[in-house]
A protein has these predicted regions:
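Q-loop/switch helix immediately C-terminal to the Walker
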Residues: 10-23
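Conserved ABC ATPase "signature" region
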Residues: 18, 28-43
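Catalytic Walker B motif of ABC-type/P-loop ATPase nucleotide-binding domains
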Residues: 72-75
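Conserved H-loop
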Residues: 98-103
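A short, surface-exposed alpha-helical micro-motif characterized by mixed small hydrophobic
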Residues: 110-112
Length: 153
């Protein structure tokens, strides 16, 4: 799922979801139920162009889920979302049957929704640790990050 939006602005939200279902040969799909999953049920007949940034992110997640991937890459996926939408986004993601690799700089989200942290430097893994282990050592995610950056200096 890209950081920027790659949606078709000239389609209505419901039509875009229907198109995606058709492209993936998904039958007997309840578009209203799908839109409700991402809190967009009230926007079914609105053009994608008129959605806010956070609404577009949620729509992108839905379209990604409809691909039934085994692995997805997310680049700052909650940009533009309010706090409630962020929580709902991560909880929806947790319900899925795929692995997510997420790029984020939001330590709070890492703390609450992630299981493992990898820090990249110059295209390689500079450090990796489970969130549980970081906390077991009495550190916050931010402290772990700053310690690793300082060591890599």
């Amino acid at each position: 799922m890209p950081q920027g939006d790659i949606l078709i602005d000239d389609l209505k939200v419901g039509d875009l979801v229907l198109l995606k279902c058709y492209m993936n040969q998904l039958e007997d799909i309840d578009i209203d139920a799908l839109l409700k999953m991402v809190e967009l049920e009230d926007f079914k007949n609105q053009y994608v162009l008129g959605l806010s940034g956070g609404q577009k992110r949620r729509l992108s997640l839905l379209l990604t889920i409809l691909n039934e991937p085994r692995l997805i890459f997310l680049d700052e996926p909650t940009t533009g979302m309010d706090l409630e939408s962020v929580d709902n986004f991560w909880h929806l993601l947790e319900e899925q049957k795929f692995t997510s690799v997420v790029v984020t700089h939001d330590f709070n989200q890492i703390d609450h929704f992630f299981t493992k942290v990898l820090i990249l430097k110059d295209g390689r893994i500079a450090a990796q640790e489970s969130v549980e282990e970081i906390h077991r050592k009495g550190q916050t995610i931010e402290q772990f990050y700053r310690e690793q950056v300082k060591m890599e200096g």
